[in-house]
């Protein structure tokens, strides 16, 4: 469809443009012995990650005898075989349905040595495959440094999935970042905390001090108390709930989860469409739950749809050649939140994009406000359509998220490396407003 084409182009344009290039510049500042991983990684942990990637590669499996180099049939078809020169080898057994190909058997040690030798190969880039000469080990590090993305757009009233971009290139990366991958969702979870507070009597204009809130953890926990910081480490002023959500303030969100409890928030998130398990810990307020992009967008769509969750579907109906319907999905529809509260949450989420007013500082700010302002450095600025939103950034800039909400369409985007130990070194670069929002 046209919308699917727009979505795929948006993902490609952003990653192939400035984002991947800025990530590679960021990686150059890291010591060679740790890149592309974060600098604090333990050398043994780094080596373990690389070993897993090596053994998962087709090149290794073909050498070790777990994959046929000729027809790519897996281990069931492959049996030990004595080659004509007397050496031990492998046979893609024709009696099992294999192609009959034979090749020399190699040990793990021999494969490790082979992975350090340069060979001609094609490697992935967002601008197209590149012919180069690399050792297979260096090609693993190259793949680790690739940024990935997922995007899904859902029509709130019908649950129809209008666009689904599971990854950046199916030929090279057979993994779905929309319905399969579960990652920590960061601050995109906060609207469910604020919705719980509003449903139980809070008002968007209620004022809270921007100061640290500490919550006692179960006995034996280390540390014994949870006291989250704001990402900008700015404290002191009095802010409204609306301003706190628009600017993703951890201090106020922690106060809400302390006052209203984790169970109420978890129950609401499930009612709105979250299906994954959510840990019963206070830090869910800041997004430690690992969810799929699909369920997160579905729950945001319920907020737009007056609090009513409509189960997502990819098929509207199937007809026979005469136009008679032979299949129509039976979608689950349920009210997860009352209409009034859902409306007020959406109004608060508009502040993310439009900005929310802070009486004490005399400023209008929101984490997604760059969508509204013109800039020569961005090609997505000056957007004027009515929109709500929520940015999200997980710990150490591992994942970047953005939820964009309009009356007719809710779109969610995730951006990050496949391996959580590969990430931007600064929040300026790694925040969801920079990595995911532009898509």
Give the location of each predicted region.
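Conserved catalytic neighborhood of penicillin-recognizing serine enzymes
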Residues: 202-265, 309, 321-351
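Short active-site loop at a secondary-structure junction
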Residues: 143-149, 172-192, 205-208, 239, ...
């Amino acid at each position: 469809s046209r919308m699917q084409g727009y979505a795929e182009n948006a993902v490609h344009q952003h990653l192939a443009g400035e984002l991947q290039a800025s990530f590679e510049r960021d990686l150059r500042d890291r010591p060679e012995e740790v890149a592309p991983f974060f600098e604090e990684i333990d050398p043994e942990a780094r080596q373990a990650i690389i070993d897993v990637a090596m053994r998962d590669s087709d090149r290794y499996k073909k050498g070790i005898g777990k994959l046929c180099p000729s027809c790519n049939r897996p281990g069931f078809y492959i049996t030990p075989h004595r080659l004509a020169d007397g050496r031990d080898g492998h046979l893609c057994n024709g009696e099992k349905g294999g192609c009959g190909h034979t090749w020399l058997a190699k040990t793990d040690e021999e494969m490790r040595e082979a992975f350090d030798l340069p060979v001609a190969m094609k490697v992935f880039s967002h601008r197209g495959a590149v012919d180069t000469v690399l050792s297979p080990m260096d090609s693993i590090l190259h793949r680790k440094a690739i940024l990935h993305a997922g995007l899904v757009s859902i029509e709130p009233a019908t649950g129809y999935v209008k666009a689904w971009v599971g990854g950046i290139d199916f030929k090279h990366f057979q993994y779905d970042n929309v319905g399969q991958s579960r990652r920590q969702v960061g601050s995109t979870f906060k609207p469910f905390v604020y919705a719980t507070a509003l449903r139980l009597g809070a008002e968007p204009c209620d004022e809270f001090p921007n100061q640290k809130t500490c919550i006692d953890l179960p006995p034996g926990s280390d540390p014994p108390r949870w006291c989250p910081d704001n990402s900008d480490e700015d404290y002191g002023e009095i802010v409204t709930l609306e301003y706190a959500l628009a600017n993703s303030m951890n201090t106020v969100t922690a106060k809400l989860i302390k006052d209203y409890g984790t169970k109420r928030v978890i129950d609401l998130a499930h009612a709105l469409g979250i299906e994954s398990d959510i840990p019963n810990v206070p830090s869910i307020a800041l997004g430690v739950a690992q969810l799929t992009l699909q369920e997160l967008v579905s729950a945001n769509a319920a907020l737009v749809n007056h609090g009513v969750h409509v189960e997502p579907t990819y098929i509207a109906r199937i007809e026979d050649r005469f136009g008679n319907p032979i299949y129509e999905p039976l979608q689950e529809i349920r009210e997860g939140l009352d209409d009034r509260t859902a409306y007020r949450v959406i109004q608060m989420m508009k502040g993310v994009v439009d900005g929310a007013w802070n009486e004490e500082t005399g400023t209008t700010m929101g984490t997604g406000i760059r969508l509204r302002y013109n800039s020569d450095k961005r090609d997505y600025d000056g957007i004027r359509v009515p929109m709500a939103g929520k940015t999200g950034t997980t710990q150490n800039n591992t994942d970047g998220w953005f939820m964009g909400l309009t009356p007719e369409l809710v779109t969610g985007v995730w951006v990050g490396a496949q391996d959580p130990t590969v990430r931007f070194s600064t929040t300026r670069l790694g925040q969801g407003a920079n990595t995911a929002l532009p898509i």
